[in-house]
Amino acid sequence: MKRIGFLTILSLIFFANTSFYKATYSKSSYYIVIDKSDYELSVYDAAGWLISYPIVFGNDDQGDKLFEGDRKTPEGTFTIIGKKIHNKWCRYMGLDFPTAADTEKFNMRKQQHIIPAYAKIGGGIGIHGTWPHEDYAVDQYQNWTMGCISLKNEHVKQLFDMMPVGTRVTIKR
Protein backbone atom coordinates (compact mmCIF):
# COMPACT_ATOMS: atom_id res chain seq x y z
CA MET A 1 0.00 0.00 0.00
CA LYS A 2 2.86 2.37 0.80
CA ARG A 3 4.30 1.61 -2.62
CA ILE A 4 1.03 2.55 -4.39
CA GLY A 5 0.84 5.79 -2.39
CA PHE A 6 4.45 6.61 -3.23
CA LEU A 7 3.89 5.92 -6.95
CA THR A 8 0.72 8.03 -6.93
CA ILE A 9 2.53 10.98 -5.35
CA LEU A 10 5.48 10.56 -7.73
CA SER A 11 3.09 10.50 -10.72
CA LEU A 12 1.31 13.63 -9.51
CA ILE A 13 4.61 15.48 -9.14
CA PHE A 14 5.71 14.36 -12.61
CA PHE A 15 2.49 15.41 -14.35
CA ALA A 16 2.20 18.66 -12.40
CA ASN A 17 5.65 19.71 -13.63
CA THR A 18 5.21 18.54 -17.22
CA SER A 19 3.99 20.78 -19.98
CA PHE A 20 2.20 19.10 -22.85
CA TYR A 21 2.20 22.33 -24.86
CA LYS A 22 4.60 22.14 -27.76
CA ALA A 23 5.83 25.64 -28.52
CA THR A 24 5.74 26.48 -32.21
CA TYR A 25 7.97 29.52 -31.87
CA SER A 26 10.68 30.38 -29.39
CA LYS A 27 11.19 33.83 -27.96
CA SER A 28 14.84 33.46 -28.90
CA SER A 29 17.30 36.17 -27.99
CA TYR A 30 19.32 35.08 -31.02
CA TYR A 31 18.93 36.58 -34.46
CA ILE A 32 20.74 36.04 -37.74
CA VAL A 33 21.88 38.63 -40.29
CA ILE A 34 22.82 37.36 -43.75
CA ASP A 35 24.84 39.81 -45.84
CA LYS A 36 24.74 38.69 -49.45
CA SER A 37 27.42 41.13 -50.62
CA ASP A 38 29.90 39.86 -48.01
CA TYR A 39 28.91 36.16 -48.30
CA GLU A 40 28.52 36.09 -44.52
CA LEU A 41 25.98 34.83 -41.99
CA SER A 42 26.34 36.46 -38.56
CA VAL A 43 24.69 35.41 -35.31
CA TYR A 44 23.78 37.96 -32.64
CA ASP A 45 22.10 37.93 -29.26
CA ALA A 46 20.95 40.73 -26.97
CA ALA A 47 24.56 41.48 -26.01
CA GLY A 48 25.81 41.72 -29.61
CA TRP A 49 27.76 39.75 -32.21
CA LEU A 50 28.57 36.10 -31.44
CA ILE A 51 29.94 34.38 -34.55
CA SER A 52 30.06 34.62 -38.36
CA TYR A 53 30.19 31.93 -41.03
CA PRO A 54 31.05 32.05 -44.75
CA ILE A 55 28.07 31.22 -46.99
CA VAL A 56 27.01 30.88 -50.62
CA PHE A 57 23.72 31.31 -52.44
CA GLY A 58 22.03 30.25 -55.66
CA ASN A 59 22.97 32.83 -58.22
CA ASP A 60 25.93 35.15 -58.80
CA ASP A 61 23.38 37.93 -59.31
CA GLN A 62 22.91 39.26 -55.78
CA GLY A 63 19.51 40.80 -56.53
CA ASP A 64 16.30 40.03 -54.64
CA LYS A 65 14.35 36.88 -55.54
CA LEU A 66 11.84 37.70 -58.27
CA PHE A 67 10.15 34.35 -58.97
CA GLU A 68 10.48 30.60 -58.59
CA GLY A 69 13.42 29.19 -60.51
CA ASP A 70 15.50 32.39 -60.76
CA ARG A 71 18.00 30.91 -58.23
CA LYS A 72 18.13 34.22 -56.32
CA THR A 73 18.05 34.44 -52.54
CA PRO A 74 15.16 36.54 -51.20
CA GLU A 75 15.80 39.70 -49.19
CA GLY A 76 13.84 40.73 -46.13
CA THR A 77 13.09 39.50 -42.63
CA PHE A 78 12.08 35.89 -42.12
CA THR A 79 11.64 33.37 -39.32
CA ILE A 80 13.01 29.86 -38.92
CA ILE A 81 9.83 27.77 -39.02
CA GLY A 82 11.27 24.26 -38.96
CA LYS A 83 14.47 22.27 -38.53
CA LYS A 84 15.43 18.81 -39.71
CA ILE A 85 18.42 16.60 -40.31
CA HIS A 86 18.70 16.37 -44.09
CA ASN A 87 20.06 13.38 -46.02
CA LYS A 88 21.61 15.54 -48.80
CA TRP A 89 22.55 18.81 -47.08
CA CYS A 90 23.37 17.71 -43.52
CA ARG A 91 20.97 20.07 -41.68
CA TYR A 92 18.09 22.22 -42.93
CA MET A 93 16.36 25.19 -41.27
CA GLY A 94 13.31 26.28 -43.24
CA LEU A 95 12.35 29.94 -43.53
CA ASP A 96 8.83 31.35 -43.81
CA PHE A 97 9.32 32.55 -47.41
CA PRO A 98 7.15 33.86 -48.97
CA THR A 99 5.87 36.29 -46.36
CA ALA A 100 3.00 38.72 -46.94
CA ALA A 101 5.59 41.37 -47.89
CA ASP A 102 7.14 39.00 -50.45
CA THR A 103 3.75 38.24 -51.97
CA GLU A 104 3.03 41.96 -52.24
CA LYS A 105 6.39 42.62 -53.99
CA PHE A 106 5.79 39.66 -56.31
CA ASN A 107 2.31 40.81 -57.33
CA MET A 108 3.52 44.38 -57.88
CA ARG A 109 6.38 43.17 -60.11
CA LYS A 110 3.92 41.06 -62.11
CA GLN A 111 1.63 44.08 -62.64
CA GLN A 112 4.62 46.14 -63.77
CA HIS A 113 5.64 43.36 -66.20
CA ILE A 114 9.03 43.01 -64.49
CA ILE A 115 8.42 39.27 -64.31
CA PRO A 116 6.45 36.99 -66.64
CA ALA A 117 2.70 36.67 -66.10
CA TYR A 118 3.04 32.88 -65.75
CA ALA A 119 5.72 33.13 -63.01
CA LYS A 120 5.16 31.60 -59.58
CA ILE A 121 6.47 33.05 -56.32
CA GLY A 122 8.22 29.87 -55.16
CA GLY A 123 9.04 28.70 -51.66
CA GLY A 124 11.16 26.16 -49.82
CA ILE A 125 13.90 28.65 -48.96
CA GLY A 126 16.14 27.64 -46.09
CA ILE A 127 19.58 27.53 -44.53
CA HIS A 128 21.45 24.26 -45.08
CA GLY A 129 24.81 22.57 -45.53
CA THR A 130 26.50 21.33 -48.69
CA TRP A 131 26.52 17.95 -50.39
CA PRO A 132 28.68 15.48 -48.43
CA HIS A 133 32.42 16.25 -48.83
CA GLU A 134 31.72 19.41 -50.87
CA ASP A 135 32.43 22.15 -48.32
CA TYR A 136 34.93 23.50 -50.85
CA ALA A 137 31.94 25.06 -52.66
CA VAL A 138 31.70 27.54 -49.78
CA ASP A 139 35.48 28.14 -49.70
CA GLN A 140 35.42 28.90 -53.43
CA TYR A 141 32.22 30.99 -53.29
CA GLN A 142 30.44 28.67 -55.73
CA ASN A 143 26.81 29.78 -55.74
CA TRP A 144 25.03 26.48 -56.35
CA THR A 145 21.65 26.50 -54.57
CA MET A 146 18.19 27.26 -55.95
CA GLY A 147 17.97 30.34 -53.69
CA CYS A 148 18.80 28.88 -50.28
CA ILE A 149 21.72 29.83 -48.07
CA SER A 150 24.45 27.17 -47.82
CA LEU A 151 27.13 26.82 -45.15
CA LYS A 152 29.89 24.26 -44.62
CA ASN A 153 28.47 21.17 -42.94
CA GLU A 154 30.42 21.65 -39.70
CA HIS A 155 29.08 25.23 -39.49
CA VAL A 156 25.46 24.32 -40.24
CA LYS A 157 25.62 21.70 -37.46
CA GLN A 158 26.73 24.39 -34.99
CA LEU A 159 24.05 26.80 -36.17
CA PHE A 160 21.36 24.10 -36.14
CA ASP A 161 22.16 23.22 -32.52
CA MET A 162 22.19 26.88 -31.44
CA MET A 163 19.14 28.33 -33.24
CA PRO A 164 15.62 27.48 -32.06
CA VAL A 165 12.56 27.53 -34.28
CA GLY A 166 11.27 31.10 -34.18
CA THR A 167 14.68 32.75 -34.67
CA ARG A 168 14.52 35.92 -36.79
CA VAL A 169 16.64 35.96 -39.98
CA THR A 170 17.35 39.17 -41.92
CA ILE A 171 18.74 38.81 -45.45
CA LYS A 172 20.20 41.94 -47.03
CA ARG A 173 22.45 42.95 -49.89
What residue ranges belong to the model's regions?
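Short, solvent-exposed loop/turn elements at domain surfaces
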Residues: 41-44, 51-52, 62-65, 88-91, ...
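N-terminal post-signal-peptidase region of extra-cytosolic proteins
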Residues: 21-30, 57-82, 108-113, 153-158
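Sec-dependent signal peptide hydrophobic core
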Residues: 5-9
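A structural motif detector for short, solvent-exposed N-terminal "entry" segments of globular domains
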Residues: 23-61
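Well-ordered beta-strand positions in beta-sheet-rich domains
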Residues: 31, 52-54, 77, 124, ...
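Bacterial Sec-dependent signal peptides at the C-terminal "C-region" and cleavage site
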Residues: 2, 12-26
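Histidine- and/or cysteine-centered catalytic micro-motif in compact active-site loops
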Residues: 37, 46, 55-58, 83-85, ...
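Exported/periplasmic cell-wall-interacting domains
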Residues: 84-173
